[in-house]
Design a protein with these regions (language model features):
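Glycine- and acidic-residue-biased ligand/ion/polar-headgroup-sensing regions
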Residues: 35, 44-62
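Conserved short histidine dyad/triad with adjacent acidic residue
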Residues: 26-42
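His/acidic/aromatic-lined binding-pocket segments of jelly-roll/cupin-type domains
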Residues: 38-41, 45-50, 67-68, 86
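Short acidic-glycine-tyrosine-enriched beta hairpin
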Residues: 61-80
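A short, N-terminal "cap"/entry segment at the start of jelly-roll beta-barrel domains
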Residues: 1-30
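Short hydrophobic/aromatic-rich beta-strand segments that constitute the beta-sheet cores
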Residues: 30, 57-59, 96
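Ligand-binding loop in jelly-roll beta-barrel domains
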Residues: 80-103
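A cytosolic small-molecule/anion-sensing beta-strand core signal
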Residues: 51-52, 71-72, 90
Length: 103
């Protein structure tokens, strides 16, 4: 059992993570960042929940780029094959649930 105060978590580098759980190959990680990630496509599904801060999520569908701002409490679901990149607007803390070892 553990309690994690996500707003207190800060990593040593952007996108640094605290591994919370690995449940039958599904990883749950808390990330801290103040810098954009990179465009990528995950091996499978990804759940991206903003716990603190704001994040501009850019994604491509049928080659067309879209963008939306995720506020604290918002969740982005990336289905397999969804190309996306997260750009925090200041500091952000994000809970990511995905296949262990995914990009």
């Amino acid at each position: 059992m553990k309690i994690i105060r996500s707003r207190r978590f800060t990593a040593e580098r952007p996108w640094g993570a605290l591994d919370i759980a690995n449940m039958r190959g599904i990883a749950t990680r808390l990330h801290w960042t103040d810098q954009p990630y990179r465009w990528h496509i995950n091996d499978g599904e990804e759940v991206f929940a903003v716990l603190d801060g704001r994040v501009e999520m850019r994604y491509r569908e049928s080659g067309v780029e879209h963008s939306t701002v995720l506020e604290t409490g918002d969740v982005f679901y990336a289905s397999p094959g969804t190309e996306h990149v997260a750009h925090p607007l200041g500091e952000a803390r994000i809970l990511v649930v995905e296949s262990a070892g995914s990009v």
